[in-house]
């Protein structure tokens, strides 16, 4: 774990200012960190991925004896986590929200969809595309979950509760990207080829969440991320309704509902870990917050913009879709959900970790106020997802 250094306000921003010169892409994002820069390794440009940096990888940091904790929780997971999955036959499918291609009225429905889409500004589409691309990188997220010691799917069809959850969660999430992708395609408002290239680059690049094969770190990360996607899709639903597209609002709201259900499952796992191993869990929580929670799509690239994720994040921050305030809200939500501030009996190191996470959100909120002021002077830049039209950061 990197040592703590002085609190750096700029580390809490949801984006970085656009750079005037070409830079090696970095997964550095902006949300919450009070640690200094860790050692990174530059990855040279290859035909299937952009030049970038990743942190020096730490693997299998969880003590082997703690694997037994997760094996002992098999029955608990079956009774308490798998219940948050829905039977396939009761799940919505993308086609439930899209024009029926076998219908006589298909072309008229598509025409109506395209007319509604004309009322929505470009900035909103940048946010919606970014959300869709994030959802479409699902192979990476399943891969990440299967790096976690003690809970991975060892065979590809394992019947352990952890493996069943990972596969079924992936299957439920798969509908999100499918639905948004088809909707955006039919809208005619976005450059699908550039979006498809971005998805391919992103899946090829992977992600660098720094979870060290530890399910403690991994499930804290997924708890945070499911809450974040619930908020983001909820915000795009609200914006769509404000712009008069009730159907798109329904789509985004339905996806948000799924994310909320998944958040419930992941936060329940961490709650159980706090019950069994409070010291180890609070240390893991502080560790993830010191590293900062990198967004799943932080390595996105479209073949043109070396700072694409930072620019997407800036637009999302300005429009209120995904903000530093949300980050602070999520942190406070998790602290309250897991009753971190009320727990006692920690070691000295555990108590310091508890104090760190419980005092972090107010600092983030102070930085959010400064970020909002800076955003008012942000420039406009072209975005390949909307045919090179300019959007304000």
Curated annotation (Swiss-Prot):
It comes from the Eukaryota. Pathway: Lipid metabolism; fatty acid metabolism. Binds 2 Fe(2+) ions per subunit. It is found in: Plastid, Chloroplast; Plastid. Residues 1-31 form a transit peptide. Gene3D superfamilies: Ribonucleotide Reductase, subunit A. Coiled coil: none annotated. One of its GO terms (molecular function) is stearoyl-[ACP] desaturase activity. Its EC number is 1.14.19.2. Fe cation 1 binds at residues 135, 173, 176, 259. Its cofactor is Fe(2+). GO terms for cellular component: chloroplast stroma. Fe cation 2 binds at residues 173, 226, 259, 262. Keywords: Chloroplast, Fatty acid biosynthesis, Fatty acid metabolism, Iron, Lipid biosynthesis, Lipid metabolism, Metal-binding, Oxidoreductase, Plastid, Transit peptide. Converts stearoyl-ACP to oleoyl-ACP by introduction of a cis double bond between carbons 9 and 10 of the acyl chain. Homodimer. Belongs to the fatty acid desaturase type 2 family. This is Stearoyl-[acyl-carrier-protein] 9-desaturase, chloroplastic. It comes from Elaeis guineensis var. tenera (Oil palm).
């Amino acid at each position: 774990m990197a040592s703590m250094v002085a609190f750096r306000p700029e580390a809490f921003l949801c984006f970085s200012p656009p750079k005037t010169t070409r830079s090696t892409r970095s997964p550095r994002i902006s949300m919450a960190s009070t640690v200094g820069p860790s050692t990174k390794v530059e990855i040279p440009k290859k035909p299937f991925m952009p030049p970038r940096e990743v942190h020096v990888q730490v693997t299998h940091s969880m003590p082997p004896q703690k694997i037994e904790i997760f094996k002992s929780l098999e029955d608990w997971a079956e009774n308490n986590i798998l219940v948050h999955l829905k039977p396939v036959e009761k799940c919505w499918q993308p086609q439930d929200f899209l024009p029926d291609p076998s219908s006589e009225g298909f072309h008229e429905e598509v025409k109506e969809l395209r007319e509604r889409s004309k009322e929505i500004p470009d900035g909103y589409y940048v946010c919606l595309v970014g959300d869709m691309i994030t959802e479409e990188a699902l192979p990476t997220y399943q891969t990440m979950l299967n790096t976690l010691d003690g809970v991975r799917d060892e065979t590809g069809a394992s019947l352990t509760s952890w493996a069943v959850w990972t596969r079924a969660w992936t299957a439920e999430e798969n509908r999100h990207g499918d639905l948004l992708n088809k909707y955006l395609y039919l809208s005619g408002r976005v450059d699908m080829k550039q979006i498809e290239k971005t998805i391919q680059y992103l899946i090829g690049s992977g992600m660098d969440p720094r979870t060290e094969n530890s399910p403690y770190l991994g499930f804290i990360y997924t708890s945070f991320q499911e809450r974040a996607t619930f908020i983001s899709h909820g915000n795009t639903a609200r914006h769509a309704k404000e712009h008069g597209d009730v159907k798109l609002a329904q789509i985004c709201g339905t996806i948000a509902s799924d994310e909320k259900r998944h958040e419930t499952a992941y936060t329940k796992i961490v709650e159980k870990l706090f019950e069994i191993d409070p010291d180890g869990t609070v240390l893991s929580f502080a560790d993830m917050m010191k590293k900062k929670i990198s967004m799943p799509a932080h390595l996105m690239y479209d073949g043109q913009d070396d700072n694409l994720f930072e620019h997407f994040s800036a637009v999302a921050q300005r429009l209120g879709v995904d903000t530093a305030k949300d980050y602070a809200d999520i942190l406070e939500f998790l602290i309250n959900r897991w009753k971190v501030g009320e727990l006692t009996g920690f070691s000295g190191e555990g108590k310091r970790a508890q104090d760190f996470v419980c005092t972090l959100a107010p600092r983030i909120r102070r930085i959010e106020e400064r970020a909002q002021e800076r955003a008012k002077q942000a420039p406009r830049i072209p975005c390949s997802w909307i045919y090179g039209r300019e959007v304000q950061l």
